[in-house]
Amino acid sequence: MDDKLIFRLKEFYALETFQVAFYEAQISTSTDEYYCKAFEKMVQIESGHADFFAQVLEKAQIELPTFTGSLFDLAGDFVGEMVGSTGRHNTCKLGIALENKAMQAYRTFITESKNKHYSELRDTLMEYLLDEEFHMLWLRDYMTHHN
């Protein structure tokens, strides 16, 4: 496993872990049952993504990136409170920005993995890209129809 692949795997582990923290924070700041259910589903999916990247790194005996627990929790809490105080519309805007960042990163990684002939990894990356696109579309739709 080359250094660039290791860097990408760690980058995606961190990105997916951050998305999980962000979406979990939204669940705890809302009373809208449908909204919470959607974020619970996103947490489930993004956790699966993070677990996948963790497993690939662990299988290669590469140390996982570590996050200072309280600092990472604080970031999730801060983002949740900040967005909660500005409303669901802005929560969705921030979520869309996160999903767009993830989609851009996935597209780059998919291209890089094609060049390296990592076909099994590419298939998984494409599945995860679709998940990110679906999340972004849900957030956009919710933002449009639920002021």
Spell out what each predicted region is.
Residues 1-147:
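Non-heme di-metal
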